[in-house]
């Protein structure tokens, strides 16, 4: 009987199967595995029954280590138990994993494989986490796409129960875990039918219980431990047969051919790739393309990674193979090769296949996209008489020269007739949600296959989102970014100014739609020369739509997503437009019906507006030979910072980081970045920004106090400074009384996120939100003040620099972060830097604050304009922040105390030096009071000129008392 089809991602597929076989789920959330735990929790709360006829008991622990401990305990008492994790979370479970495996307890850890943090945090996918647990005794099963996750996850659960070996069931984080496809799903009756209930009962019967008491986890001495450890060998030797048995059962039900290893390609292939995970789907596309041209290539898909079964690999390898490339999605610095490569090498060596050329490649670290061009490059390399023994793909390694050259654009390998669409949105603008809704409409109401994948930058709400959607009449095996699209939409006009390469991803003759408020003449001014030429030379169908004003007119505020979704259906030709409108309106009624008919009608108006508001732009012939763009402004600032911005930050900011070579990071291999880069971004993504009314303002500074991004700031200017200010600078007499200064509240339209908190807090309605372009002249005023105006003394109304008003005249040393618009967290953090920033160490836990505060190359923490000092920031882990911060404080104070001992030893050399030392020692424990004495001591030591003084001066940065902060 055919299985039901449903659009879902890999996480949901894994959760669907896990729920069926689980008594207890002990969970702790970590990206990208969290949706699995959340889904299981929701189903349990809704009363869903598993194959045993029970609701799953879900318990959330205090950490991943706690979740693993709870899993271990639950298993010991006879409950079949599951958890879901990734990355550092999985690593925290390792001690318990050794115990669970050694005690032969049946459980499954579903892992959406994610990068383990190294020189930086990365929340995206590779195999560094699962490869770090391959020695624990857990069996390991890999899947390549959401359908395989659905099909093969039962093998892990069923084999664990019968084979007495726990499993790590893993698939690629984000690329598979979050990729939406229309797949066939299991009926729980089919899963129940396959389950060995006798093995379940045997497990429960052997559980710890006072009614038949036993002892587990005892202490053993060296006389017996080794022998006892070897006693588990038969279980691992028998397990592959158990896995094969359940794969055969699934194949019988589904008509598939799943095996421990699967071969795909020419029967007489001489060039073969061996890999596991989502790259296998990419490789299959390339194999189809090359074999159709008569090339002898193939692919081995690794399903059961542990236990490793050499005979099963040799069984599927073509006898004609001459060269093999093994692909690992992890890096082990200093090793002879990565794990999968070493396993294959051992297999070939033990089989006497020394004449086969074996190479090993790394790919996809941190979710690096692996398109067909990368796989083509491997097969091309294998054609050489002496291919590189070690290589990388998907990057340009101009340092150690390991990367393979790739030809782009590569041949199109996706299924014929596949419609590919790409959407550039802003985090929180509804683009991603609308596209998920679109795929659901198309998946549920047509026979088409669908694929949806969503790409993000490192910012929170307000960052770049890119939605990759594919629709077709044949299964879609394309787990890589779209770069030859039929339809591309730019949902935020700021991306045009930022130089993002969007239209270049449109196929010749394809559609490019821009959401903007521009006329055709204004569009001509905004588009750069490269975009114009590409549009003209490739017959791109260019459209604009003003969803911004339409949304306001309808009453939807900033939410343009429904209007733009409707426009997509009109232009993309993926289904009849009348049907699309009907389904969109039905979805709106279902989603918003509880909020009342007025809300439903408003969404229906938005759908109709999207159809009517699309405007076709007639492309001028002059665009084939456009005028050159003006030269970019020269960057000003410290040389190291300017280099970082030019060579690294700017490409990353325009979503072109993939183009950076390895040499771009030679100067900061350890992950260290210059502070203050965010001030150079000037993204201009807010549609509405503040306009300050000098007459109404009472100069309370509350607007600056609450601003999450430090984009509205008070300044007091002398007469000379006011005279030199840009003409657009708004000035007022100081309040509550006039003084020698002029006051301004400067606003940065290009940095503002448009949250409106300043408007909300203003007691006199002195701030209004206005269209960003109407405030363009205020940017020069803001930049002038930031660059030239310093804090003044004796400002009227300032009773203390730690008051609301007084604090805001201090330079914020956290500015223009990647946090959400209106984020209160950054408001507090910014305030702390205004009070203590020049002397701050920050230990920042992994989490929201480490993302908005620690995006590589775009640091929002900066330095004081006068002193050059500012927060020294570091992130260790999520789980150790208090300890890490304590270690920083202990380490610093230890070095400082040792230095102070040397200072004390200089007493008696001279009266001036003694006086400086005495004052320094009196204040050494007071951060604020110690600053001037520390500077005076440095001057006295420099004047002394002795060898002892010179030795102290080598570490003079330790003299002034600092403060230590831990941010969660």
Predicted region positions:
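Ferredoxin-type iron-sulfur electron-transfer modules and their immediate structural context
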Residues: 580-581, 593-752, 759-968
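A short, small-residue-rich loop immediately preceding and capping a beta-strand
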Residues: 24-29, 56-59, 74-92, 106-111, ...
């Amino acid at each position: 009987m055919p299985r039901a089809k449903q659009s879902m991602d890999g996480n949901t597929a894994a959760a669907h199967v896990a729920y069926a076989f689980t008594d207890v789920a002990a969970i702790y959330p970590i990206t990208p595995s969290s949706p699995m735990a959340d889904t299981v929790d929701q189903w349990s709360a809704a009363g869903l029954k598993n194959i045993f006829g029970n609701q799953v008991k879900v318990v959330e622990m205090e950490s991943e280590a706690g979740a693993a401990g709870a899993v271990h305990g639950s298993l010991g008492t006879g409950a079949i138990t599951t958890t879901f994790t990734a990355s550092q979370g999985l690593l925290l479970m390792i001690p318990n994993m050794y115990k669970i495996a050694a005690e032969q307890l049946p459980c499954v850890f579903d892992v959406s494989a994610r990068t383990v943090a190294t020189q930086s945090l990365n929340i995206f996918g590779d195999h560094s986490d699962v490869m770090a647990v391959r020695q624990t005794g857990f069996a390991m099963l890999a899947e390549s796409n959401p359908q395989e996750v659905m099909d093969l996850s039962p093998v892990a659960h069923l084999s664990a129960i019968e084979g007495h070996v726990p499993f790590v069931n893993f698939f690629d984080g984000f690329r598979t875990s979050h990729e939406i496809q229309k797949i066939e799903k299991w009926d729980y009756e089919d899963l129940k039918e396959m389950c060995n209930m006798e093995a379940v009962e045997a497990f429960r019967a052997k559980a710890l219980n006072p009614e038949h008491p036993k002892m587990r986890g005892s202490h053993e001495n060296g006389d017996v431990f080794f022998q006892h450890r070897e006693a588990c060998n038969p279980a691992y030797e028998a397990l592959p047969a158990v896995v094969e048995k359940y794969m055969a059962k699934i194949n019988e039900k589904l008509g598939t051919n799943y095996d421990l290893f699967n071969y795909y390609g020419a029967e007489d292939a001489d060039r073969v790739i061996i890999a596991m995970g989502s790259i296998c789907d990419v490789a299959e596309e390339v194999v189809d393309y090359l074999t159709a041209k008569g090339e002898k290539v193939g692919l081995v898909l690794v399903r059961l990674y542990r236990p490793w079964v050499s005979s099963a690999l040799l069984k599927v390898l073509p006898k004609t193979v001459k060269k093999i490339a093994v692909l690992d999605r992890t890096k082990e610095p200093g090793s002879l090769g990565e794990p999968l490569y070493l396993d294959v090498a051992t297999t070939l060596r033990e089989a006497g296949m020394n004449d086969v050329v074996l190479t090993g490649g790394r790919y996809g670290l941190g979710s690096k996209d692996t398109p067909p061009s990368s796989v083509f490059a491997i097969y091309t390399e294998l054609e050489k008489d002496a291919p590189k023994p070690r290589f990388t793909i998907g990057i340009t390694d101009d340092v150690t020269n390991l990367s393979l050259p790739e030809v782009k654009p590569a041949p199109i390998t996706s299924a014929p007739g596949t419609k590919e669409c790409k959407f550039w949105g802003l985090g929180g603008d509804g683009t991603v949600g609308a596209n998920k809704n679109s795929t659901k409409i198309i998946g549920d109401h047509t026979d088409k296959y669908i694929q949806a994948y969503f790409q993000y930058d490192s910012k929170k709400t307000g960052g770049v989102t890119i939605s990759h959607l594919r629709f077709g009449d044949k299964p879609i095996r394309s787990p890589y970014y779209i770069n030859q699209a039929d339809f591309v939409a730019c949902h935020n006009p700021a991306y045009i100014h930022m130089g993002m390469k969007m239209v270049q991803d449109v196929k010749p003759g394809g559609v490019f739609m821009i959401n903007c408020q521009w006329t055709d003449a204004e569009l001509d001014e905004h588009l750069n020369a490269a975009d114009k030429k590409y549009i003209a030379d490739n017959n791109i169908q260019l459209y604009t739509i003003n969803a911004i004003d339409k949304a306001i007119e309808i009453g939807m505020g900033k939410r343009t997503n429904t209007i733009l979704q409707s426009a997509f259906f009109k232009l993309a030709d993926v289904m009849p437009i009348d049907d699309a409108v009907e389904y969109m309106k039905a979805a709106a009624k279902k989603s918003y019906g509880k909020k009342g008919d007025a809300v439903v009608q408003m969404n229906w108006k938005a759908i109709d507006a999207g159809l009517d508001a699309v405007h076709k732009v007639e492309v001028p012939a002059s665009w084939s030979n456009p005028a050159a763009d003006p030269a970019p402004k020269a960057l000003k600032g410290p040389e190291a910072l300017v280099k970082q911005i030019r060579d690294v930050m700017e490409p990353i900011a325009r979503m072109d980081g993939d183009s950076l070579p390895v040499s771009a990071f030679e100067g900061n291999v350890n992950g260290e970045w210059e502070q203050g880069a965010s001030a150079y971004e000037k993204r201009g993504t807010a549609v509405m920004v503040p306009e300050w009314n000098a007459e109404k303002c009472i100069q309370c500074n509350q607007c600056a106090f609450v601003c999450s991004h430090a984009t509205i700031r008070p300044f007091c200017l002398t007469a000379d400074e006011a005279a030199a200010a840009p003409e657009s600078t708004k000035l007022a007499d100081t309040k509550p009384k006039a003084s020698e200064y002029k006051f301004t509240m400067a606003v940065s339209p290009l940095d503002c996120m448009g949250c409106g908190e300043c408007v909300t807090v203003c007691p006199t309605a002195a701030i209004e939100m206005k269209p960003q372009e109407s405030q363009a002249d205020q940017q020069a005023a803001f930049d002038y003040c930031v660059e030239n105006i310093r804090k003044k003394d004796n400002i009227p109304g300032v009773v203390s620099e730690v008051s609301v008003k007084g604090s805001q005249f201090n330079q914020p040393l956290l500015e223009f972060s990647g946090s959400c618009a209106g984020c209160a967290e950054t408001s507090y953090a910014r305030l702390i830097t205004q009070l203590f920033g020049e002397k701050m160490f920050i230990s920042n836990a992994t989490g929201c604050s480490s993302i908005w505060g620690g995006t590589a190359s775009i640091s929002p923490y900066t330095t004081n304009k006068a002193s050059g000092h500012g927060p020294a920031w570091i992130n260790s882990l999520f789980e150790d922040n208090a300890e890490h911060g304590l270690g920083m404080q202990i380490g610093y104070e230890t070095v400082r105390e040792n230095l102070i001992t040397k200072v004390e030893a200089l007493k008696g050399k001279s009266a001036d030096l003694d006086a400086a030392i005495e004052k320094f020692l009196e204040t050494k424990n007071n951060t604020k009071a110690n600053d001037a004495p520390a500077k005076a001591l440095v001057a006295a030591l420099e004047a002394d000129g002795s060898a002892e003084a010179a030795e102290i001066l080598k570490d003079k940065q330790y003299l002034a008392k600092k403060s230590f902060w831990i941010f969660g």
